Amino acid sequence: MERVLRVLEYEKMKKQLLEHVSSSLGRKKVEQLTPSTDFNKVKLWQAQTQEGANMLRLKGHVPLGGIFDIKPHLKRAKIGGLLHASELLEVASTIYGGRQLKKFIETMIEEEEADLPLLGEFARQIVPLTDLERAIKQCIDDNGHVLDSASPTLRTLRHQIRSFEANVRSKLEGITRSSNTAKMLSDAIVTIRNDRYVIPVKQEYRGAFGGIVHDQSASGATLFVEPQAVVEINNQLREAKAKEQREIERILSELSMQVSEHVDDLFVNVDVLAELDFIMARAHYGKAIRATQPILNNRGYLLIKQGRHPLIPDDEIVPIDIELGHSYSSLVITGPNTGGKTVTLKTIGLLTLMAQSGLHVPAEEESELAVFKHVFADIGDEQSIEQSLSTFSSHMTNIVDILGKVDHESLVLFDELGAGTDPTEGAALAIAILDDVYRRGARIVATTHYSELKGYAYNREGVMNASVEFDVETLSPTYRLLIGVPGRSNAFAISKRLGLEEKIIEQAKAHIDEDASQVESMIASLEQSQKSAESDWEEAEKALQEAEQLRLDLQKKLDDLEKEKERILAEAEQQAEQAVKDAKEEAEVIISELRDLQKQGVSVKEHQIIDAKKHLEEAAPKLTKQQKKVKRTAEKKREFKPGDEVKVLSFGQKGHIVEKVSEAEYQVQMGIMKMKVEASDLQLIDRPQPVETKPLATIRGSDHHVKPELDLRGERYEEAMLKVEKYLDDALLAGYASVSIIHGKGTGALRKGVKDLLKRHPHVKSARDGGANEGGLGNTVVELR
């Protein structure tokens, strides 16, 4: 397997993948990566990569910073070892990074931004460990330095150390600045030797300061002396620093103990973060090479659409289309050397290995790849040459090994099968090997430049010819794979283009037997036919795309027209509602003016009534379709008699017939107004049978009677409110000082609605619940003004 991974450049692909990891955890996972032969595992890996790609597509990034491989630290803490401050800081940073990633994934799931069942399960396994992180961060700063605030003792010791250091420096600087001692010093500085403060003294003044010599210069001319005056302070400083170190170790030991208490959770977190970093590296790499998730199968079927070798730059690669394992299980790619056949072979092999490693592949959507138990490749490489094997021996050694392992779950890639020996024998061997592997049910892709194998592909069921297109004009391969067309050597055409004399080419052709010449002509014809068919297909595809675009454009215009229609209808409806509102307000103003005249005892003249009617008619909105329908219904001939209660349809008001004026016109009393109304504008109102005799009031100037109470029981809320408004108007015109509105107790909704309406009514002086003998809470007594 190692050789296959090498010749198919799997390790080079992994180096590209390594560029996308975020931590040493992910790096280790990539370094350990090998293709899996377990179909279910490969499906799982692919699904994980797809979820990672979805997160990248939606968010653009995933927080994976600050994560370290802390397993060595955890193992040491578990056995009671002391962790250094920098190691504890890595533990805290990894806890924080894990918690941030957990929150990021779970937030996306909660907000339903993406369906992430696999990554969500990983996120759920991460233990937050906030208290442990906080404990470490309170003691250690971001540079790995233990803070003064880590303990009261440490704060005191550090204060003492700073005091001692300031004291000793002050004394030594006093010596260096003194004019009496300046000539004795090599330099006027204070420095440190053996963790003690010293000054540089010339050799000849060694005894001038007393104290201890800690070091000397390379020449011996300068001695680094700790003067006697600061020896005691330096001793105190050193002792304080020793105590400081012991206190730091105590703090680190305590924190290490806390880590050991959570070591199992931390191991889980590290494993989960390693997986998530690995998954996101695969997703990032897929994005970088414009890869897609392949469809997987375990039937040995390959369908690669516009597949690209990931190691070849985009501006140099020519995508390939290939199918294998359906109508044919062997593909023989023929043609001259250096024609791109090996690149095709490596692309098929590497994309298969990538898919079986959970990586998306650089190919178009709907590409399909099989999960093989074995992938074999006989492709020449430098290592075989270094082993001093001939080309033929190298190939044959590898082929013998392959034939000993190949089965129906294998993909076998042969490059230049049978090369390196006598062409006749080599071709015969190649055919025999292909037949043997085919009988075992393996999927085969083989390249060769032997003409004999072109005929082999035509004569065997389940075997297909293919070639890599070659441009004889530019004398270079186009690297386009042509399925169903065998390759030509193009030796004569190339030689002619390079300037070889025509007579030599003709002599060479004479040495080729007629059958071989006919085969070459047939292949040339096939190539031309295929090019023509592909050109026709491309034109048909273009026409189909143009037709589809036209359909989409027309659909958009239709949708736009529908939206415009809806907008116009909505605008018209809004205008109609406003017209009705304006008309109602105008009518209320006119009625209010007439009421005021009534209250003032002013006699309403006929011309005033006519003017009011005219204003009402002007205020009335244009009839809607529904109103027109009602009007047409009302236009049916009908007879009314004096006293009939009617509804005037154009005003929506009730009144009663005073007299018949003409064949199709009646005088109608509406409140204080009398007006002539066409019969078609009237609707008869059936009078209810009287239940009991109640005292009635008569509206002045009319024979319309108004009862002293209004019974709303059984009425719907909206209709009840309208009846209350009209009843109050009628009661005012009838001269009542107070009236009763019977609404019943029920749910209380009707009672509340009546109370609210009465509070807003300008002519209601007060309203109270009925007394014990007045119906109680089921009745409201209204005092009018």
Curated annotation (Swiss-Prot):
NCBIfam families in the record: mutS2
Disordered: annotated segments: 764-785
Pfam families given in the database record: MSSS, MutS_V, Smr
Keyword 4Fe-4S: no
Organism (species): Halalkalibacterium halodurans (strain ATCC BAA-125 / DSM 18197 / FERM 7344 / JCM 9153 / C-125)
Keyword field contains Lipid biosynthesis: no
Top-rank taxon, per record: Bacteria
Keyword terms, alphabetized: ATP-binding, DNA-binding, Endonuclease, Hydrolase, Nuclease, Nucleotide-binding, RNA-binding, rRNA-binding
Function: Endonuclease that is involved in the suppression of homologous recombination and thus may have a key role in the control of bacterial genetic diversity. Acts as a ribosome collision sensor, splitting the ribosome into its 2 subunits. Detects stalled/collided 70S ribosomes which it binds and splits by an ATP-hydrolysis driven conformational change. Acts upstream of the ribosome quality control system (RQC), a ribosome-associated complex that mediates the extraction of incompletely synthesized nascent chains from stalled ribosomes and their subsequent degradation. Probably generates substrates for RQC.
HAMAP family xrefs: MutS2
UniProt-listed Enzyme Commission number(s): 3.1.-.-, 3.6.4.-
Database matches in InterPro entries: DNA_mismatch_repair_MutS_C, DNA_mismatch_repair_MutS_core, DNA_mismatch_repair_MutS_sf, MSSS, MutS, MutS2, P-loop_NTPase, Smr_dom
Broad EC category: hydrolase
CDD domains xrefs: ABC_MutS2, ATP-synt_Fo_b
Gene Ontology molecular function terms on file: ATP binding; ATP hydrolysis activity; ATP-dependent DNA damage sensor activity; endonuclease activity; mismatched DNA binding; ribosomal large subunit binding; rRNA binding
Residues annotated to bind ATP: 335-342
Record-annotated Smr domain positions: 710-785
GO biological process annotation, one example: rescue of stalled ribosome
Assembly, per entry: Homodimer. Binds to stalled ribosomes, contacting rRNA.
Name under which the protein is recorded: Endonuclease MutS2
